[in-house]
Amino acid sequence: MSALRPPARGGLGLSRLGVRLAGSRRFQLIAERVPFLRRIGRREGEELFDIVAGFVHSQVLYALVELRVLHLVAEGPQTVQALAAATGLAPERMQLLLQGGAALKLLTRRRDGQFDLAVRGAAFLAVPGLEAMVGHHHVLYRDLADPVAFLKGETEPELARFWPYVFGAGGATDPEVTAKYSRLMTESQGLVAEDALRLVDLMGVRRLMDVGGGTGAFLAAVGRAYPLMELMLFDLPVVAEAAPQRLTEAGLAGRFTVHGGSFRDDPLPLGADAISLVRVLFDHSDETVKLLLHRVREALPAGGRVIVAEAMSGGARPHRETDTYMAFYTAAMRTGRVRSAAEIAELLTGQGFSEIKIFPGLRPYVASAVTAVRPSDAP
């Protein structure tokens, strides 16, 4: 194991000087007496405490979701007593929860003591899949109960069992678990599809194959946006079996084909001039991703495009949501990791793709995109 670097000698750079001053209790006390520095210090203090209290904030949200409190006040304000009776909580415990929800701006406390839905709470309910994601976070919370043991690899995360497909076709055999996974993917995929289609122009694509397409949520969005495009879906058979009904209900009958298989074991179907990988790469290790991209290159004709769309790390400039929440979430799945756009571009280059383009996400925690082309001289 390499030794830690000794403290640098000589003068301090501006960034290190700032760190030294911020870590001085004496400087903190002086800063409290200087208006400009006081504002900076208090803002930093609030943000620091927000980090400290983050776990409790997420638990307040989880309780609101589990007890459906936001739904109960969606039609109008309610008293503490009425909400307590509806959820089985003692009034004083409901008051505790409602105060927390109001502090997080999910609820509004009225002058008469009743609680109403706030703008942020209404937005939370309207985001597809967000409530479902929070609803299964108790699994992630247990996996992170001992974060040091988790980081050392000394735990057996439960989250990996929630997402059966990450281990290949053999992992997705329980119909109940698969149905739960498919529902969550379908509910949350709509938001990703919206952002991906804003970022990447698919005009000119004749036939798109969505690999790991689940029940067809992304293809349904593509089909609506591009009415002349033919569609293909490839996923594990137990997952993809629900796709025909969904795509037919979306008005796409006659425009799609569904193919069951595992890219780990099977070549991808031929015939598409573009292949999309939406929230797929971050589920898998680098070696598995290399295999997948190799399969994609084999399935594409010369000039064919690959589109990668998912939440991505900020890389050299770490992103608050993706480099914390998404990074630890995928680590708990045991097989994947959140990658930066530059890392994805490097993986694509390594598999013979060219003309790589990076599209920073409008909402990076939802999706950014990277596209590439199979060159005409690719073997």
From Swiss-Prot:
Which EC main class describes this enzyme? transferase
Q: Under which pathway is this protein filed?
A: Carotenoid biosynthesis; spheroidene biosynthesis
- Domain of life of the organism encoding this protein: Bacteria
Q: What is its EC number?
A: 2.1.1.210
Gene Ontology biological process terms in this record: carotenoid biosynthetic process; chlorophyll biosynthetic process; methylation; photosynthesis
InterPro entries per the UniProt record, alphabetical: COMT-like (IPR016461), O_MeTrfase_dom (IPR001077), Plant_O-MeTrfase_dimerisation (IPR012967), SAM-dependent_MTases_sf (IPR029063), WH-like_DNA-bd_sf (IPR036388), WH_DNA-bd_sf (IPR036390)
Q: List the disulfide bonds.
A: none
The UniProt entry, under Pfam families, shows: Dimerisation (PF08100), Methyltransf_2 (PF00891)
Gene3D superfamilies assigned to the protein according to its UniProt record, in alphabetical order: 1.10.287.1350, Vaccinia Virus protein VP39, Winged helix-like DNA-binding domain superfamily/Winged helix DNA-binding domain
GO MF, one term, reads: hydroxyneurosporene-O-methyltransferase activity
Binding of S-adenosyl-L-methionine: at which residues? D235, R279
Q: Which reaction does it catalyse?
A: demethylspheroidene + S-adenosyl-L-methionine = spheroidene + S-adenosyl-L-homocysteine + H(+)
Key words, A-Z: Carotenoid biosynthesis, Chlorophyll biosynthesis, Methyltransferase, Photosynthesis, S-adenosyl-L-methionine, Transferase
PANTHER family per the record?
O-METHYLTRANSFERASE CICE, PUTATIVE (AFU_ORTHOLOGUE AFUA_4G14580)-RELATED
Explain the purpose of this protein: Methyltransferase that mediates the O-methylation of 1-hydroxy carotenoids. Converts hydroxyneurosporene to methoxyneurosporene or demethylspheroidene to spheroidene. Also able to produce spirilloxanthin.
UniProt record similarity statement = Belongs to the class I-like SAM-binding methyltransferase superfamily. Cation-independent O-methyltransferase family.
Q: What is this protein called?
A: Demethylspheroidene O-methyltransferase
The organism's lineage is: Bacteria, Pseudomonadati, Pseudomonadota, Alphaproteobacteria, Rhodobacterales
Gene name tied to this protein: crtF
